[in-house]
Amino acid sequence: MKIAFFSSGTFGLPVLEELKKENHEIVLITKVDAPSGRGLKLQPSPPAVVAEALQIPIVKVNSLKNDFIEWYFSQGFDVAIVVDFGFYIPKQLFQADKPVMVNIHPSLLPKYRGPNPIRRAICSGELETGVTLIKISEKMDEGDIYLQERVLIDPDDDYVSLTPKLQHVSMELLKKFFLELKQGNLRAFPQLGDPSYAPKFTPDELWIDWQKPAHDIQNQVRALADVGAKTTLGSKLVKIFKVRISGMEDSLPPGHYVAEKESLYVGTGQGSLEILSLQQEGRKKQDAASFVKGLREKEGVFGG
């Protein structure tokens, strides 16, 4: 099958690799190289890096205008897959009968429409999420549903552990999609239920408010497990990557920590947390036991 694969982020990488393994003829359409890192050097998108390694043809774009549209329809694609792309898809593309265009969205639509569904589902304390394959529409993530599958969110799941589960389900749903398309059984149905939106995290949302309940802070840390939820210790930035609800009595004021043996506990607005993994500015990421060994003060305040 000849596939146009529209992607600029990381979520679609395992799907791209699996499609290549299954010997589909793929062309990657991705964003042009963008400045990144300390030196702001031009860097290719993550899919472009993978595609180059797999010898997949790459088309880099900064918009999808007339020249691109003409090229696109001249290629004889059977299917167009859109996942974590970052550009508006023109109506000429998504309304065409061929190639059939499908968008992979990692939520149970209509819940968590928008660019950040995985983090938002975790941060909201959801017990389940999923993957939905939809038609592209003029309004973001409002297209009819081809296929949908639920995925349980385990209590210990965070962004790092949940994302691969959703990527695996995405590929399994695509296989079903290809089969139904081949058999002429592909159908789509309207989204039902109350919609919600999943915007990107604002800079303020990356910081921990220790006045919030322990459960809410735990969910925030789980949602930011790859980048770390921010706080401070004195003048130093601290990123927290993993916590759990502590069995300690509510004796610690919000933000106040105490180090006991190899454990680190911190008070919140309701309950307390045990910090398991963190990184202080200028140091490597550490488990709590290693961090505690280097602490001069066994009691203090985060975010103070």
UniProtKB/Swiss-Prot annotation:
Its domain of life reads: Bacteria
Q: What EC number is given for this enzyme?
A: 2.1.2.9
In Gene Ontology terms, what is one molecular function of this protein? methionyl-tRNA formyltransferase activity
The cross-references to Pfam families, in alphabetical order and at most eight, read: Formyl_trans_C, Formyl_trans_N
Q: Which residues bind (6S)-5,6,7,8-tetrahydrofolate per the record?
A: S107, L108, L109, P110
Q: Provide the top EC class.
A: transferase
Keyword field contains Methyltransferase: no
Catalytic activity as recorded in UniProt? L-methionyl-tRNA(fMet) + (6R)-10-formyltetrahydrofolate = N-formyl-L-methionyl-tRNA(fMet) + (6S)-5,6,7,8-tetrahydrofolate + H(+)
List the keywords (alphabetical).
Protein biosynthesis, Transferase
Q: Quick check: keyword Nuclease in the entry?
A: no
- Cite the CDD domains for this sequence: FMT_core_Met-tRNA-FMT_N, Met_tRNA_FMT_C
Its biological purpose? Attaches a formyl group to the free amino group of methionyl-tRNA(fMet). The formyl group appears to play a dual role in the initiator identity of N-formylmethionyl-tRNA by promoting its recognition by IF2 and preventing the misappropriation of this tRNA by the elongation apparatus.
State the family it belongs to: Belongs to the Fmt family.
- The name this protein goes by in its record: Methionyl-tRNA formyltransferase
